[in-house]
């Protein structure tokens, strides 16, 4: 692959704006933590139990207390906690679904390492076992300047586009397409991430999320122009 472009809509970018070199995606690691304790009768023999639910709860609080990094933004979130089997049973199992993020790969790795320490510490505190399983990851985005300039030149010709800019100073999430971008660039290709602005009824991942469908036509025409007008014989 010589040229690669990923696209998104929204993310706080206003309608009529196309960001042709989005570089604010955070590196991220997604993982599950499986806690295994010992079940016991909660009324008759509670001392025989090793409470996986309490270990997971302690880990959750510790994860959200990880210190920030001086070199950039970081994030951690426990999105799911599942535990236990019955109200009269000391919980023998618990599951946490966790993600870490960082403005760079280094910062994300720092948060991830601290997260592993917190989880292991909570497991030790309650005398339970824990296993973490990697579920996904992405790197930070670093668009290729020449490709960004070409995308800007094409987006600027599309009706409904008020401005085609290189980047924005705004927070974003993470994006697995960054791994494909990095792979293309490692093989001397060029890559970028384009965000098409649109009005949103509610933020991303909100149950009331909706968008103005005019952005779809703008995106399709931009991508069409990018391919149809490209100087294939000489490249850029």
Task: Give the role of each language-model region.
Residues 53-236:
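Metal-dependent amide/peptide-bond hydrolase catalytic core
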Residues 1-76, 80, 85-89:
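Histidine/acidic-residue-rich, glycine-tolerant segments that coordinate divalent metal ions
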């Amino acid at each position: 692959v010589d040229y690669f472009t990923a696209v998104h809509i929204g993310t706080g970018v206003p309608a009529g704006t196309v960001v042709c070199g989005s570089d604010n995606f955070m590196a991220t690691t997604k993982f599950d933590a499986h806690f295994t304790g010992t079940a016991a009768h909660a009324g008759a023999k509670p001392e025989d139990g090793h409470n996986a639910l309490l270990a997971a709860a302690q880990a959750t609080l510790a994860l959200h207390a990880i210190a920030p990094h001086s070199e950039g933004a970081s994030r951690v979130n426990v999105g799911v906690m599942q535990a236990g089997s019955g109200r009269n049973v000391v919980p023998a199992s618990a599951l946490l679904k966790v993600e870490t993020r960082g403005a760079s790969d280094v910062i994300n790795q720092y948060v991830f390492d601290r997260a592993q320490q917190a989880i292991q510490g909570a497991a030790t505190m309650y005398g339970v076992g824990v296993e973490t399983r990697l579920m996904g990851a992405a790197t930070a985005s670093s668009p290729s300047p020449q490709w960004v300039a070409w995308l800007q030149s094409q987006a600027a010709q599309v009706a409904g586009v008020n401005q085609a800019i290189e980047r924005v100073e705004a927070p974003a999430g993470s994006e697995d397409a960054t791994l494909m971008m990095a792979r293309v660039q490692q093989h001397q290709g060029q890559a970028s991430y384009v965000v098409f602005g649109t009005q949103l009824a509610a933020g991303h991942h909100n149950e009331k999320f909706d968008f103005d469908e005019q952005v779809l036509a703008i995106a399709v025409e931009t991508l069409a122009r990018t391919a149809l007008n490209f100087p294939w014989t000489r490249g850029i």
